[in-house]
UniProtKB/Swiss-Prot annotation:
Pfam families: UPF0102. It comes from Aliivibrio fischeri (strain ATCC 700601 / ES114). Belongs to the UPF0102 family. One of its GO terms (molecular function) is nucleic acid binding. This is UPF0102 protein VF_2212.
Length: 123
């Protein structure tokens, strides 16, 4: 149980780091850890007229691949489904609402942050 709590605390720490990084780049915070049956969205931000669904990935080393490589095809599908659910839940039209999927990859205890806009292409 302690290992799971420690992992969750670490996840929250890096999500907050990513949120602050994006806020420094003029994005507005909307929500963190939105959960549904389809999955979880780490961060929901707003970039001018667009909603930004952000997946935060952290890796201490790149021995097993970079943080952004950890966003698998299956994870991308879950993110897309969860984002569409969030839009519908908030009475926003999928066809008439601007949104994108970004990844914030954090390496080396936060010394390196890589923000990848449009990392996941809808479709």
């Amino acid at each position: 149980m302690e290992k799971k709590q420690n992992k969750r605390a670490k996840g929250e720490f890096y999500e907050l780091m990513a949120q602050r990084y994006l806020e420094q780049h003029q994005l507005t915070f909307i929500a963190r850890n939105f959960q549904s049956k389809t999955g979880e969205l780490d961060l929901i931000m707003r970039d001018q007229d667009s909603f930004v669904f952000v997946e935060v990935k952290y890796r201490n080393t790149s021995n097993f691949g970079s943080a952004q490589e950890m966003v698998t095809w299956q994870k991308q599908r879950k993110l897309q489904r969860t984002a569409l659910f969030w839009l519908m839940k908030n009475k926003l039209s999928v066809e008439h609402t601007s949104f994108r999927f970004d990844v914030v990859a954090i390496h080396a205890q936060g010394k390196e942050i890589n923000w990848i806009k449009n990392a996941i292409v809808e479709g």
